[in-house]
Curated annotation (Swiss-Prot):
Subcellular location field: Cell membrane
GO MF entry, a single one: heme binding
Membrane topology, record value: Peripheral membrane protein
Residues holding heme: 7, 10-11, 25
A GO CC annotation given for this chain: plasma membrane
PTM statement from Swiss-Prot or TrEMBL: Binds 1 heme group per subunit.
Superkingdom: Bacteria
InterPro entries: Cyt_c-like_dom_sf
Annotated keywords: Cell membrane, Electron transport, Heme, Iron, Membrane, Metal-binding, Transport
Protein name: Cytochrome c-555
Amino acid sequence: ALEASGCLNCHGTDLTGXPAXPATMPPGMFKGSNQQLKALSEFIHGLSAK
């Protein structure tokens, strides 16, 4: 679960120009669902912010 969260978080930052995520989870997998991915990323960031 932690690896999945870290990967989503990584790709979330990638959407804003951040570094790419790990190669084990290519951004292409999320093509067409960036909005959902962004929501998940923001949710994860919210948890880590607290």
